[in-house]
């Protein structure tokens, strides 16, 4: 093999290793809900999915993965984080359940976030019983605005 061909082959192998190392695994997204995870029927809730900058699509999934909503309106929150928002304008008991997020950032899809459980309960109406619990989050890292997420 000629010295030039050997050098070229070595360069290609080094570049391939560098590209493979840079791709790595995508960080897991995080999921949270506002105003909280315990919601009264008829109230609204917004799920926030967060991931790194460069996300093209966020996906909010129900526990069985058959129901999902994609959002392409990804907002940049800062130099390293982006977010998508998914709204349910009038929550019903059918919306209760486990939700999680994932995102698409070329060249592929991230892992799923941890599950977040949405509970739909009637308010007791007492002054010491708030309609919702404070915001809750699950998962580890980093969207947009999309319309409602239908009950199954």
UniProtKB/Swiss-Prot annotation:
Disulfide bonds listed in the record: 49-101
Region (Disordered) residue spans: 120-152
Signal among keywords: yes
Segments forming a coiled coil: none
SMART domains tied to this protein: IG
InterPro entries named among the record's database cross-references: Ig-like_dom_sf, Ig-like_fold, Ig-like_Receptors_ImmuneReg, Ig_sub
Name this polypeptide is given: Leukocyte-associated immunoglobulin-like receptor 2
Gene transcribed to yield this protein: LAIR2
